[in-house]
Amino acid sequence: MAAAASASSPVEFLLRRPAPRRRRLPLAGAFFAPTGLAGATLLRAVASLAASLVAGARPPSQRRNVDALARRLALLSAILESILLDTAAAGAFSDAANLCFRELYVVLFRAELLVSYVASAGRAWALLRSPHLAASFRDLDAELAVVLDVLPAASLRLSHDATGLLDLLRAHCRCRAPAQYHDPDEAALRERLMDALRQFDLGQPPDHPSLQSLLADMGISTAASCRAEIDYLEEQILSQEEDTDLPLVGSVLALLRYCLFAVFDPSNAKALRDWPLSGNRQRLLSIGGGDDTSFSVPKEFSCPISLDLMRDPVVASTGQTYDRPSIIQWIEEGHSTCPNSGQTLADHRLVPNRALRSLISQWCGVYGLQYDSPESNEGMAECVAASCSSRAAMEANKATARILVRMLEDGSENVKAVAAKEIRLLAKTGKQNRAFIADLGAIPLLCRLLLSNDWMAQENAVTALLNLSIFEPNKGRIMEQEGCLRLIVGVLQNGWTTEAKENAAATLFSLSVVHNFKKLIMNEPGAVEELASMLTKGTSRGKKDAVMALFNLSTHPESSARMLESCAVVALIQSLRNDTVSEEAAGALALLMKQPSIVHLVGSSETVITSLVGLMRRGTPKGKENAVSALYEICRRGGSALVQRVAKIPGLNTVIQTITLNGTKRAKKKASLIVKMCQRSQMPSAMALGSTLTVVDRSLVGNNTLRRAASFGSGELSNPISISVQVP
């Protein structure tokens, strides 16, 4: 295998990657026997696989079925060894025998996957899936029986003892009734788990001794093992197997989270404090935010259009794969052919390339990068929230929140840090969770932790406030809490960790959605200055949070002077050259350029106008709209000198034409008004541009959209209404 995977292979990294924990039941799909094997070599491979299964460790779940499978395979191993010892028979097998051995290899390989799945599964998950797992073992026995029935025993010249073992094995594969695959002990334990959920459903948490007994029988004896079970259930919720009962899994998840603090001593919090956030819990970073340049993106993972790592790979009608935003932009610009092959696009349907997305995600994992696929943000939060919608889950989460708030109030510094971390996770999903956590009085307690000398306590406290602020009524509670805004800005200025500072910026972004809070945030000493500094010097993630906060603040009519004196305008101008934040920066500048002083500051730089035109050419539809709006404000308020400078930009003619044809309604309007201003200008260069654009305008006289756009008067950029906040 090592020879087959060359250094240039895009999947070479998989050879160095530890096998991931299997999530899905592994019996569906096609399996193939190893090619090129036959005769004694194939038989040895089958015998080796059977022997390894017999000698393998027994998982705690499905022990009865695993033991029964091991007994059958022990008989099979004895039969295979008998055949191998008969050198005359092992020399050459008939085609029928080789075919049977290949099928036997497939059955054993599926058995190995099933046992491995059961061994790696969380105990709670295995209990919930017990009926499905039992059915899988029953299917394995049936498949093994079929192969043994067609095995040509006569041509293999089995000994008398081997023939007897074969008959016994065939009988064993058929003797078990379906009910015998279900372990009564596991069924009883599963029923006890369901009974605990029913008590929560009635609003009566189970007593601690019964929960302790239940966890002990499930093999969950420590806080760390309980946390591992919680992580595993979250992974299963996100994997969304087709027949998974998400509300039931979410209820068990909430029960285990309650047990984590109700059963295990929270004062011994070191294990929970040091427990790492799972990959699904971490706030996803941009590839461009890292400083590691010791690797290059495989060309197979790069979009042929943008040449960047594909975040959302999709397959076009020609069979070529592109990143979704890039191919959508290509189509919206009026192209009807495939960029890579040149073939005509039969339609505009785009099919997600999930296999490639999985490989890209694994590659990012190997190199320590986090892959923000479109399904991993909004979809993850929505999925977990939906799974916790049952009454039992909500009651368990409420009971957990009560314990955590008490820990915040009365615990040691170490316990408070753990409580803040768990509240952060509990507030990650579901408006009900965010509502009752705030109702229990968590916000003032979290605010106090912002002053903590413990970096983890501070980081988790500010992130918990961010997650709580997503619920609209909680924004008011945070802003009304005396000193809370000042403390959030303090973390933004002097936080112990980069993540704490970034989450403080994200919290300001979330709070700035409310119009009445914009001025309060702007007037808080240091708030706008620190956002501007983060926009200039922060990581990609920090810049994104900062620019979105500044964009929201810019929608306030009194923001211009504050933005100018705090150097936020300069930071926004510099950010036009950064693709990560250029679209939001252009939108903020368009809003701020109601003030002549800002217009001249922005328009005085040749690179600003060039950057805006570049964004009009390559940005998303919203980015193009922001860029053309900013350019419109420069032309409208900057005077004829700036109009002349705009008119000299190479390629502006083509960009304006493209936007008037394919842009958003507002972008078309602004582009048409830019054309009119250039035409009215008496400057020679502006007149030259105007004549060129007049030709374009006349050629499109029949275009109703452009004709309507040409009749529009001056318009203002409307304020943003909706936002999307990623939850750390």
UniProtKB/Swiss-Prot annotation:
GO BP, sorted A to Z: protein ubiquitination
GO molecular function list: ubiquitin-protein transferase activity
Pathway, per record: Protein modification; protein ubiquitination
CC annotations in GO: cytoplasm; nucleus
S-S bonds: none
EC number of this enzyme: 2.3.2.27
Keyword annotations: Repeat, Transferase, Ubl conjugation pathway
InterPro entries assigned to the protein according to its UniProt record, in alphabetical order: ARM-like, ARM-type_fold, Armadillo, RING-Ubox_PUB, Ubox_domain, Znf_RING/FYVE/PHD
SUPFAM superfamilies in alphabetical order: ARM repeat (SSF48371), RING/U-box (SSF57850)
Catalytic reactions on record: S-ubiquitinyl-[E2 ubiquitin-conjugating enzyme]-L-cysteine + [acceptor protein]-L-lysine = [E2 ubiquitin-conjugating enzyme]-L-cysteine + N(6)-ubiquitinyl-[acceptor protein]-L-lysine
Positions of ARM repeats: 441-483, 526-568
Domain U-box: 296-370
Principal EC category: transferase
Role summary: Possesses E3 ubiquitin-protein ligase in vitro.
Identification of the protein by name: U-box domain-containing protein 4
